[in-house]
């Protein structure tokens, strides 16, 4: 990664605390994250992610918030901008500072190449209380749609490390 990219990312990560959102209950952090993606608001999305974030996304691992911010966050923003995510079911659990939010969504719309999307997306989010707000420490997305899986491989998405 270039020095300029590292500096820009560091400045963005330092600034994200200002956005903090109003994620006072676990599901608020997840919903605010999805809204930030849909609105193409990188700073707001990052403000909802804990510094210890690990993302599992369709067989690919982003082991740090920095790796996610550089590799997959831009792709997730692009997809969110052209799709609609309808919440179908949700369960929330855990206690103390660590909670989990398990959701299924019906995702419809188009990919950036115009390919239609109509699938069920499964999401597991683990959130942790940070002061009076919750931040996401782990995300795991999956779908059993083989066409979508194939399109991700063709798009040049980074492979699992």
Question: Which residues make up each language-model segment?
Answer:
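Solvent-exposed loop/turn segments at secondary-structure junctions
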Residues: 52-53, 60-62, 107-109, 142-146
């Amino acid at each position: 990664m270039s020095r300029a990219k590292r500096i820009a990312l560091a400045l963005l990560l330092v600034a994200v605390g200002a956005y903090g959102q109003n994620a006072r209950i676990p599901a608020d952090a997840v919903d605010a994250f999805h809204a930030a993606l849909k609105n193409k608001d990188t700073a707001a999305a990052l403000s909802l992610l804990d510094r210890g974030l690990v993302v599992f996304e369709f067989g690919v691992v982003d082991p740090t918030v920095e790796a996610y911010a550089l590799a997959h966050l831009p792709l997730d923003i692009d997809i969110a901008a052209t799709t609609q995510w309808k919440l179908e079911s949700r369960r929330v659990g855990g206690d103390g500072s660590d909670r989990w939010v398990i959701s299924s969504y019906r995702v419809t719309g188009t990919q950036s190449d115009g390919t239609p999307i109509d699938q069920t997306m499964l999401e597991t989010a683990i959130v942790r209380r940070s002061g009076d707000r919750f931040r996401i420490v782990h995300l795991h997305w999956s779908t059993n749609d083989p066409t979508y899986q194939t399109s991700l491989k063709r798009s040049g998405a980074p492979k699992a490390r």
